[in-house]
C-alpha cells in the first residue's frame, strides 16, 4: 500500500482546506519545493499535489510551484487540479508528472478521460469526490445527482490507473478516514482505490492496510502530517509491511 503525502497549493503556498472550503485554508508554508524534499527525506517515493486554484479556474494556476516540486522530489508525483484538456494532460507528463488526476472532467466528459487513459496508459487517476455518497465537482462547489459507485463503474474498462476517493465531509478535519465507504467502493469496483480525507493518525493507515486485499492501493494524508499527528516514516513502514 502506498502513502501519498499531500501538498495542496493556493497562491503558491502550501495549505490545507477544511472540507474543500477555500475560505478555510490553513497555510503551512510558502516553499512547496522544500516541503516536497522533506517528504522525500522521510522516505516517501510518492507525492500527491493539488493545484487548488486550478480546480476552480479549470486551468493551471500554480505551475511555477508544481515545477519546483518536480525538480526537488525524485519520486513519483501525482497531480490534480483543473486538468481538463489534452494539452494540459500531455504538458504535465512532459514535465515529469507520473499520474494526472481528473475529477470534474470525469463527470462532465467521461469519454475524454477514457481517451486520455488510452493515450497515457497507467497515467490517469479518476477522482471520485463525494458528499454524502454523491459526486461533487468544480472544486467541490457543485454536488451532482450521480452516486460514487455509478461514476466509478463508468471507468471500469477504460484503463484508468486508480480511483481517488475523497469524503469531502472529512477532508482536512482529522475525523478519521471513512473506512466503510472506501472499502465498499473498492469491493464493488474493479479498479484500485486510493483513500483520501480525514486521516488523523497511524490507526487509519493500519485499518486501510488490513483491507489492502479488497483493492485499497493507497492513502493520501495531509493535515495529520503537518500537525505532527502522523509520522510519515512510520506510516510508510506500516503501509509497505
Curated annotation (Swiss-Prot):
Gene Ontology MF term list: 1-(5-phosphoribosyl)-5-[(5-phosphoribosylamino)methylideneamino]imidazole-4-carboxamide isomerase activity
Any one Gene Ontology BP term: L-histidine biosynthetic process
Catalytic activity field: 1-(5-phospho-beta-D-ribosyl)-5-[(5-phospho-beta-D-ribosylamino)methylideneamino]imidazole-4-carboxamide = 5-[(5-phospho-1-deoxy-D-ribulos-1-ylimino)methylamino]-1-(5-phospho-beta-D-ribosyl)imidazole-4-carboxamide
Alphabetically ordered keywords of this record: Amino-acid biosynthesis, Cytoplasm, Histidine biosynthesis, Isomerase
EC id: 5.3.1.16
CDD domains: HisA
Pfam families registered for this protein in UniProt: His_biosynth
InterPro entries listed in its UniProt record: Aldolase_TIM, His_biosynth, HisA_bact_arch, Isoase_HisA-like, Isoase_HisA-like_bact, RibuloseP-bd_barrel
Superkingdom classification of source: Bacteria
Record organism: Novosphingobium aromaticivorans (strain ATCC 700278 / DSM 12444 / CCUG 56034 / CIP 105152 / NBRC 16084 / F199)
Glycoprotein keyword on record: no
Protein's name in the database: 1-(5-phosphoribosyl)-5-[(5-phosphoribosylamino)methylideneamino] imidazole-4-carboxamide isomerase
SUPFAM superfamilies: Ribulose-phoshate binding barrel
Amino acid at each position: 500500500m502506498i502513502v501519498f503525502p499531500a501538498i495542496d497549493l493556493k497562491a503558491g503556498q502550501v495549505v490545507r482546506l477544511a472540507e474543500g472550503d477555500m475560505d478555510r485554508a490553513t497555510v503551512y508554508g510558502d516553499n512547496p519545493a522544500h516541503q516536497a524534499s522533506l517528504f522525500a527525506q522521510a522516505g516517501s517515493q510518492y507525492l500527491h499535489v493539488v493545484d487548488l486554484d486550478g480546480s476552480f479556474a479549470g486551468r493551471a494556476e500554480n505551475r511555477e510551484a508544481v515545477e519546483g516540486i518536480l525538480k526537488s522530489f525524485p519520486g513519483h508525483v501525482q497531480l490534480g487540479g483543473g486538468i481538463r484538456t489534452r494539452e494540459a494532460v500531455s504538458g504535465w507528463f512532459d514535465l515529469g508528472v507520473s499520474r494526472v488526476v481528473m475529477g470534474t472532467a470525469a463527470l462532465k466528459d467521461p469519454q475524454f478521460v477514457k481517451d486520455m487513459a488510452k493515450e497515457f496508459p497507467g497515467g490517469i487517476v479518476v477522482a471520485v469526490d463525494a458528499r454524502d455518497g454523491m459526486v461533487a465537482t468544480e472544486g467541490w462547489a457543485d454536488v451532482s445527482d450521480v452516486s460514487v459507485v455509478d461514476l466509478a463503474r463508468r471507468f471500469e474498462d477504460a484503463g484508468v490507473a486508480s480511483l481517488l476517493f475523497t469524503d469531502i465531509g472529512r477532508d482536512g478535519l482529522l475525523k478519521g478516514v471513512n473506512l466503510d465507504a472506501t472499502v465498499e467502493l473498492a469491493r464493488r469496483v474493479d479498479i484500485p482505490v486510493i483513500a483520501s480525507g480525514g486521516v488523523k493518525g497511524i490507526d487509519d493507515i493500519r485499518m486501510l492496510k488490513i483491507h489492502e486485499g479488497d483493492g485499497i492501493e493507497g492513502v493520501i494524508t495531509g493535515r495529520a502530517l503537518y500537525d505532527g499527528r502522523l509520522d510519515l516514516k512510520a506510516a510508510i513502514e506500516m503501509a509497505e509491511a
